[in-house]
């Protein structure tokens, strides 16, 4: 079985980390000082939080990093027992060939409040022998007593140019010919998520060792941006029936979900506003309509009916504005 590329090409050192230069610079200072306070990485998936944690641990702990490093995923182990047992057992052991031990707890925002309180107590108890690296998508879900005990690092989505450069490197290493348009579409759909981008690249690779635009669409099951923009333009220009027919083709024939389509609607409307194709006052109204549609779909309403109703509201934007 082939190794997933996301693991095969995971950066092993802080110098190899892509797109988080300021954060890497701050982490390198910890390596120089050979000390580590409790820290928290926060940001969306695929932006380098786990990679930075592993690279930092290897740099600080050296050849014995595996013996002195504990990684837990809070999605798999959310309860108080995990905090009290696994973390406590690990922290009680003396560091082997290293100045201290490191506990990396991923997806901490999925832990219950009681488990977070238990974690806070363990962080206080073993502060002289162990350091904690906490990772989460939403720091607002972490209790204040934990946040106040951590240096917080906020990870931004990785820039498109950095992701494309990395994808080209991987394609070159694997002997794959990737179309530029295919790479650009991967970046468009992943919105700064390096992990997802690499997974799509691997899944889109054909038996002929090529990555084409069509192969990318087959993997991600999303509508082409130009088709979404065509629907929006038709609706804004009062051609509702044509817009509705295009929408139905995408949902029924291509099998694109309502959740994905409403996200793409937002992306295209935002892009068109940036390009000054949609006035800001109209953008505000469109956002209101799209957010209402998104809410209704998530609450269980029929996605196609909600999106068709959204298109009918698009017809009203110019006269409302």
From Swiss-Prot:
One of its GO terms (biological process) is DNA repair. One of its GO terms (cellular component) is DNA replication factor C complex. GO terms for molecular function: ATP binding; ATP hydrolysis activity; DNA binding; DNA clamp loader activity. ATP binds at residues 43-50. The keyword Nucleotide-binding applies. InterPro entries: AAA+_ATPase, ATPase_AAA_core, DNA_pol3_clamp-load_cplx_C, DNA_Rep/Repair_Clamp_Loader, P-loop_NTPase, Rep_factor-C_ssu_arc, Rep_factorC_C, RFC_lid. It comes from the Archaea. Part of the RFC clamp loader complex which loads the PCNA sliding clamp onto DNA. Belongs to the activator 1 small subunits family. RfcS subfamily. This is Replication factor C small subunit.
